[in-house]
């Protein structure tokens, strides 16, 4: 049995916004739920979860539905998205490869 997640209100609201935008894009293109589900490569049930804003749906699947329906992800221009991705990768490269718990500070002297 899958573990139940407790999502923060902001996550729930953002998921609902993305799902609503995807539904608007689908309706503007006059695609049925079945048509978009086929284009995304998921079941109708999964697509309905996306449109309802279910935060448990896979991120890549939701992003693909958004891309196909014209919902902008981060930046309209692909060049800007790629530039931001390069910047994020550069920042990540200078950080430690993993986080370690900070040791206790002994300040009793």
Predicted feature residues:
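DNA major-groove recognition helix of helix-turn-helix/homeodomain DNA-binding modules
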Residues: 58-76
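A short, Lys/Arg-rich alpha-helix, primarily the initiator
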Residues: 2-28
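Short basic helix-loop element that most often maps to the first helix and adjoining turn
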Residues: 20-35, 64, 94-100
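Short alpha-helical DNA-recognition segment
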Residues: 30-48
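Short, charged recognition helix plus adjacent turn
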Residues: 76-109
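Short amphipathic alpha-helix starts
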Residues: 15, 40, 74-76
């Amino acid at each position: 049995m899958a573990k139940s997640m407790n999502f923060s209100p902001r996550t729930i609201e953002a998921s609902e916004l993305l799902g609503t935008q995807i539904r608007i894009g689908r309706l503007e293109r006059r695609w049925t739920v079945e048509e978009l589900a086929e284009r995304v490569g998921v079941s109708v049930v999964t697509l309905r979860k996306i449109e309802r804003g279910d935060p448990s749906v896979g991120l890549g699947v939701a992003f693909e539905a958004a891309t196909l329906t014209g919902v902008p992800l981060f930046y309209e221009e692909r060049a800007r998205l790629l530039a931001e991705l390069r910047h994020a990768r550069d920042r990540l490269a200078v950080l430690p490869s993993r986080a370690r718990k900070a040791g206790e500070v002994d300040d009793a002297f």
